[in-house]
Amino acid sequence: AFEGDNGLYGDLRSGHVPSFSFIVPNQCNDQHGRGNGGATCNFDPSSNGTQAGLNPALIYRGDVTLQRLVQAIWASPAWKVGDNAIVVWWDENDYSLAPNVNKVLLIVYTNYGKHGIQSPILYNHFSLLRTLEGVFGLPCLNHACDSNVEVMSDLFSR
């Protein structure tokens, strides 16, 4: 849970957070704009001004949720101690045509490295897995150590 003294924001305020956190937003806050049918999280099946049934308010809500979360992490005492990183990675591609198909946006914020880096390396989802496995000294899962999977060292360097 994000809210309350026992939730994520409480942990961030206290500075007591785990070494690794994997945060996945719910359907109301995931920027897909589809929602779950709840009273405050509606999917709009009509085409009257919406983007093919997407609810623009839910896309905005996801943007605000992400902004609030990143700001809370930056304000946390935990962010100021040691080497920390925030990785924001979307799971949808940009629908680009060949030869640049299936590009997804990845943003890495660190409290220690260079800022404004734009990597020329084409990474995939296994690249993040391989990078994390290396950081934590874990064995490779699935295809994370295939020869075509790059470690994201340029995005986490000093």
Regions found by a protein language model. Give the residues of each.
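N-terminal pro-sequences and low-complexity stem/linker regions of secreted or lumenal proteins
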Residues: 1-158
